[in-house]
Amino acid sequence: MNPIFTKMVDAVEAANAAPDDYINPADGLKYCGKCHTPKEAFYPAELQAQGFTKHPVMCKCVAERREREEAERREYERMSYMTMLRSEAFRDMPAAGWRFESAAVTTPQLAKVRGYAQNWDEFKKAGIGLLLFGNVGTGKSYAAGCVANALIDRLESVLFVGMSDVVNRMQGNFGADRDHYMKSLMRPDLLILDDLGAERNTSFGKERVFDVVDKRLLTGKPMIVTTNIPLSVMKQAVDLDDRRIYDRILEVCVPIMFDGDSFRKSTAADNLKTAARLLG
């Protein structure tokens, strides 16, 4: 037997040894004193003929411990990656806690949006997004945030940004910096553009919005757009720049109307009642 190989086997056996190990007289192999399974195995006959008889193996309890440790390591890495994805997704939005499960009210619209998240693989493959439109305070941004968190739980990358912030960033950057920022908007699996129409109503602003929407469409990756602009206005837009933007969005985004009372007004009314009670 090769002396170097012998030393390697001896070193492994020494590292694998425990005080309660024992030799099983039935087969002459070393067994674990805890789980009573072999810590050695015989080489195939052709190797035994060359002087190689036994080699170390993991007993059952050591193998199970290694498996647990590996599972814990993988879970730690998964949770760390998920934390990173969430911090990247909500840089400028307080949406990390927005979830379908914790919604105060499950509206029909929220149920539809949840269906989008549940069938994400198919929508992602087809490059289909959502257009969430309706009055102020009806839960459009919350619904989009719920989708984001549901996808991040599946380790999908998401970026949730306000449209006005996008335009401001584009206006403040030039050349390579603007290109770099544009690429950052194209990179995630899902891009959420919040509050279309809140950006500056200028030719520059409209050009930047169109650039983002158009380039995102060309990537084939989905986007979710939220807006207070009625769907009828988007479909009947007279201004050429507006029509170009809306046509591109409607080409790949399924519209869902959010109506009903404003949740913000309801929350404000509840806060006033609480304050009145506490202040006497």
Roles of regions detected by a PLM:
Residues 108-117, 148-188, 200-203, 207:
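Short glycine-rich substrate-engagement loop in P-loop NTPases that contacts/grips substrate
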Residues 156-157, 187-190, 219-225:
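Loop/turn-to-beta-strand initiation segments
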Residues 124-144:
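Walker A/P-loop nucleotide-binding motif
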